[in-house]
């Protein structure tokens, strides 16, 4: 199914899954420019087959909490950029002009995604 790309849109009911994935209603949104540490329930860390996974669970929780706090500061905007292999929307996420990915990187709670 093709994804219609649009200008930034308001996310009315954001919820945070982990440091780099949120939900806007039913839409799963992956913050496009970062990789955040995994949480303990991540299959990437359970089976240890994915060497690229960042399996620092304390940092994963800190990243999730920081994103929750950032998103609670104001209107959450998403700018859709495409989809990832898991069917999530890839997007830039911002609050009050602050890019969520850049913010988490600046706090040491995420790394740039390549």
Say what each PLM segment does.
Residues 2-114:
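Small beta-barrel nucleic-acid-binding modules, primarily SNase/OB-fold domains
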């Amino acid at each position: 199914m093709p994804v219609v790309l649009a200008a930034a849109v308001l996310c009315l009911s954001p919820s945070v899954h982990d440091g780099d994935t949120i939900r806007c209603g039913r839409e799963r949104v992956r913050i496009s420019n970062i990789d955040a540490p995994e949480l303990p329930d991540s299959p990437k860390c359970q089976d240890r087959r994915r060497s690229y996974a960042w399996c620092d669970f304390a940092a994963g929780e800190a990243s999730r909490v920081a994103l929750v706090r950032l998103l609670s500061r104001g209107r959450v905007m998403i700018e859709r950029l495409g989809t990832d292999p898991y069917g999530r929307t890839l997007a830039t996420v911002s609050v009050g002009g602050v890019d969520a990915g850049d913010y988490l990187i600046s706090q040491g709670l995420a790394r740039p995604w390549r």
